[in-house]
Amino acid sequence: MLFKSKTSLFNYLLKLIRIGSGSQGVCYLDKANGKIYKIFHDFYDDDLEEEFKVNYTKEEFTKFSKISNDTYVFPEEIIMVGFKVCGYITKYARGLDLCGINPFTINLDTFTSDISNAHQGVEQLSKDQIMSYDVLYNILYGVNGFKIIDTTDYSFTDLDYQALHKQNKEYFDRAVKLFLVSNFFNSFVNTQKDLKEMYKDADSLEFLKLFRQRLSEQLGNEVLYLRDAKDLVKYTKNTD
């Protein structure tokens, strides 16, 4: 998407909804087409000396434009002012930052199904020979399951499929296990030898199955939401 000047881009952005910002830039939503427009911070800083600005290239943001994946959200098009890349366009991923969701509100049946679907996305990513990066704080979760955003630092790799898939899956699984356990159930997990070992290394689906089973056994009834196990909570500072 090409704009002749900063002013023309700013005028265009005024028609959109500002939905937030991160370390890389500011995001705007176009509700009409369901797209996100991400504008890099450098673009707004007129006082930043040119030598300190990042010179982005088209290739950085179009390398995955033909990749189809239901879990990972990739840039589809770049935004340029003149000859300068100042942002990119991607589809809108509905959901909230997983790190900011209260785990007690999650239906564990639905969560289990959504993890399974996300694992299919991880598998496809690995088949496409793409190495993920910085997954932990870039996971959204909502009615459409897991969506992983801010994928611009991902890269194609020659790593063999098994090793690549293991690495990509571990990045995702670690985030899920942290979400389920961190600060609330650390003490409970640490008292269960098998759970403790699985928390370190296991697939998040396998861990969740046993975690839920152990909670249910301890309480004497089926745990559907983690809030059902609130009597087992011991508030601990996360050290992972």
Model feature map: region roles:
Residues M1-K15:
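A short, low-complexity linker immediately N-terminal to eukaryotic Hanks-type protein kinase catalytic domains
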Residues Y12-I78, N102:
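ATP-binding glycine-rich loop module of kinase domains
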Residues L29-D30, Y92, L140-G142:
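Conserved hydrophobic "DFG−1" position in protein kinase catalytic cores
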Residues K35, T71, Y88, K147-D150, ...:
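Protein kinase-like catalytic core scaffold
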Residues L48-F61, D114-S116, H165-R174:
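Well-ordered, non-membrane alpha-helical segments in soluble/globular domains
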Residues S68-D114:
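Conserved structural core of kinase catalytic domains
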Residues G100-L140, F146:
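Conserved kinase catalytic-core helix
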Residues Y141-D240:
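C-lobe/activation-segment region of protein kinase-like
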